[in-house]
Amino acid sequence: MSVLIRPLAIGDVTAAVNVIIGGSTKPEAEQPDETALYWAAAEETRNRRGEVLVAELDDEVVGICQVLIFQHFQHTGGWCCEIESVHVRADKRSQGIGAALLESAEALAIERGCYRVQLTSNSVRRDAHRFYSAHGYTASHQGFKKFFTS
């Protein structure tokens, strides 16, 4: 098995969104037919020095993560990386694909001069927490979110 980690292409959007739906705690929030909106988010991420990465296996998109790069107001305005939307298709988990995505995201953060990488994971995703811990992440902070209704 050889997984390829590469930037998202416009033709990957629907498959990538379906990977997210398969692992999401709120799949109803996703609309895979809204390709233009997802592509705009990917372009905005790139415009801000980040990237949306996909994992490709046997010509199929089986994983995704979004790498956000921003200048932090702490650490003398140092660059920071936030990894979001890490998902691997359920039938492809525990095969090193998530690790390859994480490694590529971290390499991009280092290349862009980031002093730190951070991520959040839903509190109910215990397997994901074990995965991140096994890859050197520590549960050092507690995160909070507030959703707005439209």
Residue ranges and their predicted role:
Residues 54, 60-69, 87:
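Conserved beta-strand in the GNAT
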Residues 43-54, 82:
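A short helix-loop-beta-strand connector motif used in the catalytic cores of GNAT acetyltransferases and
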